[in-house]
Design a protein with these regions (language model features):
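Donor-sugar nucleotide-binding helix/loop cap in glycosyltransferases
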Residues: 1-212
Length: 212
């Protein structure tokens, strides 16, 4: 099976991104490849963020695009359902489903798959996970040359996806900041020590476990 690392270009999912992406996939399926309009102007984000959003829509299972020909995006059945029933991703249950899609997507989000399905350390550092990931990669001949920088960036992106920045940098980011990823609401990762940069996998609160 193919493996993919650092396809996010270091950009984690920001609040509102997935909703914005779905809106334009619905109205303009070629939004990411159109030559008549600049995707940056249409989406209101920078070039690298456009690439990241294109990747994330597919990684969380909302959209798909062909490997050949005109690579326009279209909704998956799951994506169509989310767009019809919770396009602004306001329900906790929708977040859980998006997380499940991401964490089970070994081909498109390899580091996420290993982190949530096979990495069993409850308390860990970056080096712990990257070393574990390197061991798994060595078992896959086609992915044996993955750069350590890519693995480090994937770890950082995982942390930024699930851990709000007001916890990691409380003096620099306000709790209501919209730069955070909505997946942080799930409470799946917590920080043990900002100084030592140690983290732990967390058990979601009762409120988030009753999402509907």
């Amino acid at each position: 099976m193919a493996m993919k690392f650092r396809a996010h270009d270091t950009f984690f999912i920001r609040k509102g991104w997935l909703s914005k992406g779905m809106k334009y996939v619905q109205s303009k399926p070629d939004v990411f490849i159109a030559k008549d309009e600049n995707p940056m102007d249409v989406l209101g984000i920078g070039a690298n963020m456009v690439k990241a959003l294109r990747y994330w829509l597919q990684a969380v299972g909302l959209t798909t695009e062909p490997n050949k020909g005109k690579r326009t995006q279209s909704f998956t059945l799951f994506g169509q359902s989310v767009y019809e029933h919770d396009r602004y991703i306001e329900e906790m249950g929708t977040l859980y489903l998006l997380h499940y899609k991401l964490a089970s997507n070994k081909e498109e989000a390899t580091a996420w798959y290993y982190f949530f399905n096979e990495f069993n350390m409850s308390e860990f550092t970056r080096d712990d996970f990257v070393s574990f990931l390197q061991q798994r990669i060595r078992m896959e001949e086609e992915a044996s040359d993955v750069a350590i920088r890519s693995l480090n960036d994937d770890f950082t992106c995982i942390i930024n996806t699930y851990l709000p920045r007001y916890k990691t940098s409380p003096n620099r980011v306000a709790p209501e900041s919209n730069i955070d990823c909505p997946f942080g609401e799930l409470g799946l990762i917590d920080i043990l020590s900002r100084e030592k940069k140690t983290y732990r996998k967390a058990i979601p609160s009762v409120n988030t476990r009753d999402p509907w």
